[in-house]
Amino acid sequence: MRNKSQSFISSKLIFICCSILVLFILFLKRASFSSNSTATIRDEYHQKSKCPSTPQQCTKLPTSLSDALVHYVTSEITPQQTFDEVSVSKRVLDKKSPCNFLVFGLGHDSLMWASLNHGGRTLFLEEDEAWIETVTKKFPNLESYHVVYDTKVKDSNKLMELKRTEDCKAVSDPRDSKCALSLKGFPADVYETQWDVIMVDAPTGYHDEAPGRMSAIYTAGLLARNRYDGGETDVFVHDINRPVEDEFSVAFLCGGYMKEQQGRLRHFNIPSHRASFGTPFCPADISRRF
C-alpha cells in the first residue's frame, strides 16, 4: 500500500515538474517573440522618422510671389500692358532671370515685373515722388528711385534732330555724354550696373507739357551700348502707337536691332559696342520697320 502510494506521489510530482517546465519554455518563447516584435516595430518607426541624408529643397512660395498673386487676383485695376504685350517681355525674362532689370516707371505692373524676375534685381525709376511713397508703402520690397526729367513732349521734333550729331552717336557712360538727350541725374548705381533688360514705360508722355520718353529711350540705348561686360541688353518700349515712342525708338534704338513688335510694345536687342571698337551706332539696315 505504501509502495503504491509513494509511486503515485512520485508520478504526480514528475507531472507537475514537467508542466512547469513546459510553461517556462512557452514563457521564454513568448517573451522572445514580444521583444523581437517590439524591436522590429521600433526599427521601422526610426527608419520612417529618420531625417533624409540630403536636405530637401524648400517648396514654400516666396513672399514676393504670394504678394503678387494676392494683389492681382483681388485688383480691379487694368494693367498698363495687355496679355500679349506682357508675354513678349516674359519670354525674355524666362531666359534671363534672375537678372538686372531696369524699369522706367512705377505702376500697376511693377509687382508683376519684380515677380517675373524673382531672385534678380528689379529697379524702378519714377518721376512722381508721392506715387513712390504710395506704392512702396504697400509693397516695401519694390526698389525705386525718384528721378527728374527736364524735357517736354512739345520739344520732341527739335530733339529728334540730334540723331544726326556726332555727340549723340558717341558711345560712353551717359554721365559723360555730350548729347542733350542723355540723362545724367540718376543715382550712380544706375550707370554702373550692367542691365540685362530695360523697360521704357515712363515718364508721362500723353500731353505736350509732359516730359515725354525721348531722353529715357536714348539713355536706355546708351546704357546697353556701353556695357563693359560685352553682353546684350533687351530693351522694350511701350506705347509705340504715339509719335515720340515710335520715332525715337527706331532712331536711337535702331530698326536694325528690332526683334519684335506686339501691340503697343516694341522689343530691341542691343549688343555692347565696347566689345568691338568702330561699331556703328545703328546697323546698316536702320530703315527696317515692323
UniProtKB/Swiss-Prot annotation:
The chain crosses the membrane at residues 8-28. Coiled coil: none annotated. The keyword Thylakoid does not apply. Expressed in roots, rosette leaves and stems. Disruption phenotype: No visible phenotype; due to the redundancy with GXM1 and GXM3. Gxm2 and gxm3 double mutants show reduced stem mechanical strength. It is an enzyme of class 2 (transferase). It is found in: Golgi apparatus membrane. GO terms for biological process: methylation; xylan biosynthetic process; xylan metabolic process. It is a single-pass membrane protein. Keywords: Golgi apparatus, Membrane, Methyltransferase, S-adenosyl-L-methionine, Transferase, Transmembrane, Transmembrane helix. It catalyses: glucuronoxylan D-glucuronate + n S-adenosyl-L-methionine = glucuronoxylan 4-O-methyl-D-glucuronate + n S-adenosyl-L-homocysteine + n H(+). It comes from the Eukaryota. One of its GO terms (cellular component) is Golgi apparatus. Pfam families: IRX15_IRX15L_GXM. Its EC number is 2.1.1.112. Its main location: Golgi. Belongs to the methyltransferase superfamily. NCBIfam families: A_thal_3515. This is Glucuronoxylan 4-O-methyltransferase 2. It comes from Arabidopsis thaliana (Mouse-ear cress).
